[in-house]
Amino acid sequence: MSETKQLLLSEYTPMSELILKETIVSKPKYDVIDVHTHFGLIGFNGDYRNQYDTRRSVESLREAGVKKVVNLDGMWGNELDRMLEKIKPCEDFFITFGTVDTSRLDEKGFETYVRNTLKESKEKGIKGLKFLKDVSLVIKDSQDRYIPIDDQRLKVIWETAAELKLPVLIHIGDPVAFFKPIDPFNERYDELQHRPQWSFCKPGIFTFEQLMEMQENLLKNNPDTTFIIAHGGSYTENLACVGEWLDKYPNMNVDIAARI
């Protein structure tokens, strides 16, 4: 009997022997509205204006059965103008969401800035708001503290969104494993070895449990604001819990965009 070679886990790439009938689904049974897309700064990490042809991209999506998309990269001000100009050839295909600059949180007149920006953006055509996980996990205030998503200083955003009837799509939490040590017990060990910057298991950063508590506070304290909690309601590892939230908070919706 030949001696078995020791194999590192990182070298293990097995090929499945499972034989199945191949079924190619070229189009969905029903028209699709993709509520989580990025056609601007977030999606292309910089100047997107020459990185895709709007007409060709839309044609490709329509052929695949996509009826409309929610473009979450509207931003605000001049950037919103650039985004709207980019998608103008097919503007009926796009539902664009904007946002505000939360890094200005501690500036004098922040509340006035938020109200004016959102009103101006709505007049330009945005249909909702988008907020990244940066609010709780990246951006810090003037006291060098991370900003809880349920922070009272952000209240003006949710109130104005309700007044203007703008739904808020918000990314709050990442996969639970991203908040745990990168060790042999972490189910995303291989992924985090390749992308260590995705780990939030660091001193001073909110835990996953704290973020979920903030998320509930946000929903509970702003009943007139319609929220779409991105990526399966922040907690795809526990859909029973997400289901309880959906039953408990009528203003909560979820999207099913992947967080890969």
Please tell me what each predicted stretch does.
Residues 6-10, 14, 78-198, 253, ...:
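Active-site gating/metal-coordination segments in enzymes
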